[in-house]
Amino acid sequence: MRKEPRSIELLSPAKDLICGREAINHGADAVYIGAPKFGARAAAGNTLDDIRQLCDYAHLYSARIYVALNTILKEEELAEAEQMIWQLYEAGADALIVQDMGITQLNLPPIPLHASTQTDNRTLEKVRFLQEAGFTQVVLARELSLNQIREIAERTTVPLEVFVHGALCVSYSGQCYLSAALSGRSANRGECAQYCRLPYSLIDADGKEIVSGKHLLSLKDMNRGEYLEELLDAGVSSLKIEGRLKDVSYVKNVTAWYRKKLDAILA
C-alpha cells in the first residue's frame, strides 16, 4: 500500500561544478559530488571553492548538495577529515555521504550523514543499526529485490535511497578486494582498478578451457526506468543515478529522462 504523501528525490551525480549545475538545470532535486579527498572516486575530487559555488547555485533552485566522503580512513587522516567536514559544512553542503563509522565519533558540525552504499546495506538489521546511529538517509545495496526493499521500508523510518541507473559491480559494494589483491589499489580507498571489466577465460577442474576471452565478471549497467512506480510503492524516498565519472552530456540527458518519467508518475 502506497504511503501518502510522497516526497521523492531524484539524485544525480556530478564529477565537477559544470556537471552539477547541468544536473540541477535538467531536473535533479539533489546532486552528489566528491569531496576534495576521501571519496570513493579518487579521480572525481573537487575543490572547496567549486563545492561552495555549486551549493550556492543549488540553493537558488531549492536543490540539495550531498558531498561524498565515502572511503575507509586511516587513523592519521581523521583530523584532516574532521577539518574538511567543517569546511564543507561552511561551504553549504546539505549532507555528507560516508562509509567509515569512525566519522560519527569526530567533532562534527550539525550536518546530516547519509550511509553510503559502501557500508553494504543489505539487511534490515544493518539499516536499523544505521538509523539508531543517527544516519538520516541510507543507500541500499543495488542487489536487493523489491520485496527486500519493501520489508526494510516497512520496518524502519529512515529515508531509503536506491540506485536506478548506472554501473553494477560483480561484488557487494564495500566488500570487493579484487583490485587491492591484484594491484594494491583499494576500492575502499577510491582507487578501484576495475579488474572485473577485463576479459577472462573460464577453465574447469581438469584444465579444459570452457570460455575464452569473455567479460565474465562485467555486469551490464542497471536501468530501472520501467520500475519506478514499484520502487516508490515499496517505500523508497530517493532515486539515485550512478555516474560521478560521467561527462556532462550523460548527466544531463539521463537526469532529464528520469525527471520526465518521475513527473509522469507523480502527476
Where are these regions (language model features)?
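Extended, well-folded interaction surfaces typified by the phenylalanyl-tRNA synthetase beta subunit core
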Residues: 132-137, 144
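Active-site pocket-lining/capping segments in soluble small-molecule metabolic enzymes
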Residues: 2-121, 140, 148-238, 245-267
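Short, glycine/polar-rich helix-capping loops at beta-to-alpha or helix-loop-helix junctions
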Residues: 122-126
